[in-house]
Swiss-Prot record:
Record's catalysed reaction(s): coproporphyrinogen III + O2 + 2 H(+) = protoporphyrinogen IX + 2 CO2 + 2 H2O
Enzyme class: oxidoreductase
Ranges for region Important for dimerization: 246-281
Residue sites binding a divalent metal cation per the record: H102, H112, H151, H181
Main location as per UniProt: cytoplasm
Name of the protein in its database record: Oxygen-dependent coproporphyrinogen-III oxidase
Organism, as annotated: Vibrio atlanticus (strain LGP32)
HAMAP family in alphabetical order: Coprogen_oxidas
Gene that this sequence comes from: hemF
Cited PANTHER family: COPROPORPHYRINOGEN III OXIDASE, MITOCHONDRIAL, OXYGEN-DEPENDENT COPROPORPHYRINOGEN-III OXIDASE, MITOCHONDRIAL
Taxonomy of the source species: Bacteria, Pseudomonadati, Pseudomonadota, Gammaproteobacteria, Vibrionales
């Protein structure tokens, strides 16, 4: 197995955060990210620090957050050891970049991406490590061209790593970003992977890099195509209603959110994925044959793109 290089992973993640922020600022044309660099106090349950960057009230993006964090703890939280009992009693480090973009225009999909590295160590034993991550798209008024180009970018970046990688990680994404209480997928998916170490460090790291860099390549062309689409109050209301699903998923099911909160992570950074505005409506039903109804009938279930 190739040597584990934690510093190389960290430097890649820092440069990825810089690159994505620059590209999003360019796409917005008005707003800039504000950085909040933070460091854990000695003696806290979780050590380490990070850079939280948030953009608000842009011309294109209502709110966007791009987080880097590198934290360490003396014991893994329950959310991690539940499916990996061998991690109990090990000290750990977790580092990653996580981002969520909430555009103003309802015709631009919300998007999310995350790439991360975990290592859990115990004296006298081999380290347990893995990579995880992915990206997914949540349209409110989906356009097939956008969904297809998003998945094509995902397919292309997976190709060098194996013939089955796209299909496996696409299906994993469909299963992961699913709300059982609504019987809906969160959006049209993308890629999701976790616990990746069977390829060895070098190839696993290379794949994580490809996914991290693939996000902007997949998302920004969609932003450009849709940012001038006219919309009114009806579309805005529906966007805010559907953002409620984003909140439901993140607070009830998302493993990263649960891990962060259970391990004593930085709450403000963890919850920066929340939309600035969302709404709920009792027993909402879209009008028959409307564009809103089309989202439910055709897009909130796994599809071949």
């Amino acid at each position: 197995m190739s040597a584990i290089d934690k510093e190389a992973v960290k430097q890649f993640l820092l440069s990825l955060q810089d690159s994505i922020c620059q590209q999003l600022e360019q796409a917005d044309g008005t707003a800039l990210f504000e950085e909040d660099a933070w460091q854990r106090e000695p003696g806290e349950r979780l050590g380490g620090g990070g850079r939280t960057r948030v953009m608000t009230n842009g011309a294109v993006f209502e709110q966007g957050g791009v987080n880097f964090s590198h934290v360490a703890g003396k014991a893994m939280p329950a959310s991690a050891t539940a499916h990996r009992p061998e991690l109990a009693g090990r000290k750990f480090e977790a580092m990653g970049v996580s981002l969520v973009i909430h555009p103003k225009n309802p015709y631009i999909p919300t998007s999310h991406a995350n790439v991360r590295f975990f290592i859990a160590e115990k004296e006298g034993e081999d380290p347990i490590w893995w990579f995880g991550g992915g990206f997914d798209l949540t349209p409110f008024y989906p356009v097939d061209e956008d969904c297809q180009s998003w998945h094509q970018t995902a397919k292309d970046l997976c190709a060098p790593f194996g013939d089955d990688v796209y299909q496996e990680h696409k299906e994993w994404c469909d299963k992961y970003f699913y709300l059982p209480h609504r019987d809906e997928t969160r959006g049209v998916g993308g890629l999701f992977f976790d616990d990746l170490n069977e390829w060895g460090f070098e190839k696993s790291f290379a794949y994580m890099q490809a996914v991290g860099e693939g996000f902007a390549a997949a998302y920004l062309p969609i932003v450009e195509r849709r940012k001038e689409t006219p919309y009114g109050e009806r579309e805005r209301d529906f966007q805010l209603y559907r953002r409620g699903r984003y909140v439901e998923f993140n607070l009830v099911y998302d493993r990263g959110t649960l891990f962060g909160l259970q391990s004593g992570g930085r709450t403000e950074s963890i919850l920066m994925s929340m939309p600035p505005l969302a709404r709920w409506e009792y027993r909402y039903e879209p009008q028959a044959c409307s564009p809103e109804a089309l989202l439910y009938s055709d897009y909130l279930k796994p599809r071949v793109w």
